[in-house]
Structure formats: C-alpha cells, structure tokens
Amino acid sequence: MKLLEERILKDGHILDDNILKVDSFLTHQVDFSLMREIGKVFAEKFAATGITKVVTIEASGIAPAVFTAEALNVPMIFAKKAKNITMNEGILTAQVYSFTKQVTSTVSIAGKFLSPEDKVLIIDDFLANGQAAKGLIQIIEQAGATVQAIGIVIEKSFQDGRDLLEKAGYPVLSLARLDRFENGQVVFKEADL
C-alpha cells in the first residue's frame, strides 16, 4: 500500500536495527484517515470470504481493526492483555510473547463473543515473529471459530512470523513489508497489494 509506505518513510524511526517506531500515526497517536484507508483495503480484499468478526490484540491493533470491521460491517473484538474482574466466566486465553516488549502475556477474549459459526479475520499492527497472531489463532480455535486470514499493517519480512503462519495454513496479507533497514532507512519488499 503506497500511502502506508510513504508514511513510514516520512514519519517512521528505526531503533536498534530491528525496531520501527511509528508512534506518530499507528502505535501511540493514531491517524484516523490513514487507518480508515487501511480498513477499506482489508475489507475490499476479504469482503468475499464471509467474515463475521474481526479480531485483534490490544492496543495498537485496535485502530486498524476497528476501521476494517466498520468497512465490513461486522463486530471487532480485541484480546485483552490484563486480567479484568468483569471477565470472570467463559474466558478463552493464550500465552503471547511480545518481540517489542520482550515479555510474555496471557491474552484473553470472552468466549461469548465467538462461536463455531464465526469466520474471523485477524488484524494486527505488526508481524514480527508471529506470536501475537499465533495466540489469537489459539483463542479463536478454542471457540470453534475459523480463521479465514490474517491482515497485517506492517510486516518485518526479515523475521519468521509470516513463514510460521503460512506453513500452518493461514493466509497472510501485509500492506507494507519491510525487507531490511539499511543506512538508517527502511527498504521495502514488494507488498501483497
């Protein structure tokens, strides 16, 4: 997605040779017009697959996921990273390791929001090692629902997340694919769209 790649080049910052900071439009402050365009692109790509729910993980996946759900006219569910006293029955959980934060969290979704009839589109802000998506897949499958595809805003193609997910049989669509960081600049790999 050319618009996203241009924004990454303009406002993204490389940290430690393997982390891209995009807090000015995605991971802290949100550019809603860009997120709306991202949502439309994902919705157009997956409209024919019968998606009934969009699922993400808090926090930075929420903006692109909610705009995708809006464009598809389906509910969006986000997995919570912290235990909540109001979520006390029928909770579906998985362990997720965060590459950026270097911690493992138990993420959860109330089971009442997913059913075996659901066809789910996972949306996330980044794909690095695939652990967030893997955890969401585990939760979705605990409910008996089906993962139709995984939509990623920014993929770090130099890490093994995509390979892990595709080998497990899940289609992955990334709007921006980072090939590498070179001389303080992002070098893109051809995106899926």
Swiss-Prot record:
InterPro entries, A to Z:
PRibTrfase_dom, PRTase-like, Pur/Pyrimidine_PRTase, Xanthine_PRibTrfase
User: What EC number(s) are associated with this protein in UniProt?
Assistant: 2.4.2.22
Classify the source by domain of life. Bacteria
Which BP terms does GO give this entry? purine ribonucleoside salvage; xanthine metabolic process; XMP salvage
Swiss-Prot/TrEMBL keywords: Cytoplasm, Glycosyltransferase, Purine salvage, Transferase
What subcellular locations does the record give?
A: Cytoplasm
Supply the HAMAP family for this chain: XPRTase
Q: Which NCBIfam families match?
A: PRK09219.1 (NF006671), XPRTase (TIGR01744)
What family does the Swiss-Prot or TrEMBL record give for this protein? Belongs to the purine/pyrimidine phosphoribosyltransferase family. Xpt subfamily.
| This protein's name | Xanthine phosphoribosyltransferase
User: What organism is this sequence from?
Assistant: Streptococcus pneumoniae serotype 2 (strain D39 / NCTC 7466)
